A protein has these predicted regions:
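A short beta-loop-alpha structural element at the N-terminal edge
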Residues: 2-16
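Hydrophobic alpha-helical core bundles mediating ligand binding, dimerization, or RNAP-core interactions
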Residues: 12-22, 187
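Active-site rim helix/loop that mediates acceptor-substrate recognition in acyltransferases
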Residues: 22-76
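Short hydrophobic/aromatic beta-strand element in the GNAT-like acyltransferase core
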Residues: 49-53, 84, 113, 146, ...
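A short, internal acetyl-CoA/4′-phosphopantetheine-binding micro-motif in the GNAT/acyltransferase core
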Residues: 103, 112-122, 149-150
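Conserved acetyl-CoA-binding loop-helix of GNAT-fold acetyltransferases
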Residues: 122-136, 158-162
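C-terminal "cap" of GNAT-fold acetyltransferases
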Residues: 143-146, 150-157, 161-204
Length: 204
C-alpha cells in the first residue's frame, strides 16, 4: 500500500469511496456534489487544496492485504484506491463556519474527508493517510494541522487522539436542533503541532 496524490484516472474510485463512506451520516453529500468537488481537485488542480489516495498494488488487492504484494516493485501502477483524504491551506477552499470557535486559522492546514474502504479497514490505512498529510504540510512549510471530527465517531476520534491531535473546541448545539428528530452529533475541532520553531510559511 502507498499514499500519493490522486490522479485523473482515480476520480470515479474516489467519488465511489467518499459516497459509500459517508452514506447515512450527517456529512453525506449528493453524488453530483462529490463528483464536482473531486474533479475540481484532481483534474482542474488547485494549489491551495490537494487530494491524496491510499492505493493497494494489484497483488495486495488480489490477496486482500499486504504481504507479498508489497514486495512487488510496481505490480499495480494503478492499484485499487482504498483510502482518500484532502488537505487545504486556505480558508477560501473551506465552507464558512457558523460558530467562529470552530473555524481553523485562515492560513492553517486543514485535513478533511478522510475515509477508508470498508474492505480495507483495520489495516493502518487511516493512520497512513494522516501521516502523509502531515508530511506534505511540513514539506510545504506548514507547522500544524487542524481537523473536525464528530463526537459520535469513536474510531476516527481515537485515531486522531492517538496520533497526537488535541481538542481545541466543541461545536455548540443549536437551540432548535432536535425538535423534529434531526439532532446532529456535535463536531470537535482538533489540532496537532508539527513543529514549534515559530516558522509557518506555506510555499506555493
Amino acid at each position: 500500500m502507498r499514499v500519493e496524490r490522486a490522479r485523473e484516472g482515480d476520480v470515479k474510485a474516489c467519488v465511489n469511496l467518499v459516497c459509500d463512506a459517508f452514506a447515512g451520516t450527517e456529512d453525506a453529500k449528493p453524488r453530483a456534489y462529490v463528483l464536482k468537488y473531486v474533479v475540481g481537485l484532481v483534474v482542474d488542480g488547485d494549489c491551495e487544496e490537494t487530494a491524496l489516495v491510499a492505493r493497494r498494488r494489484a497483488r495486495e488487492s488480489e490477496t486482500g492485504g499486504e504481504g507479498e504484494g508489497e514486495m512487488e516493485d510496481d505490480a499495480g501502477a494503478n492499484g485499487e484506491v482504498v483510502g482518500f483524504v484532502t488537505v487545504s491551506i486556505s480558508a477560501k477552499t473551506r465552507p464558512p463556519e457558523r460558530d467562529r470557535n470552530m473555524s481553523p486559522p485562515d492560513d492553517a492546514a486543514y485535513l478533511a474527508n478522510a475515509c477508508v474502504a470498508e474492505s480495507a479497514r483495520r489495516e493502518g490505512i487511516g493512520r497512513a493517510l494522516v501521516k502523509s498529510v502531515e508530511d506534505l504540510v511540513l514539506e510545504m512549510g506548514g507547522c500544524d494541522v487542524w481537523l473536525h471530527v464528530r463526537e459520535n465517531e469513536p474510531a476516527p476520534l481515537a485515531l486522531y487522539t492517538g496520533e497526537g491531535y488535541e481538542r481545541v473546541s466543541k461545536e455548540k448545539s443549536n437551540v432548535f436542533e432536535g425538535m423534529f428528530g434531526d439532532k446532529r452529533a456535535s463536531r470537535i475541532m482538533m489540532r496537532k503541532e508539527l513543529r514549534s520553531d515559530g516558522s509557518c510559511n506555506f510555499m506555493l
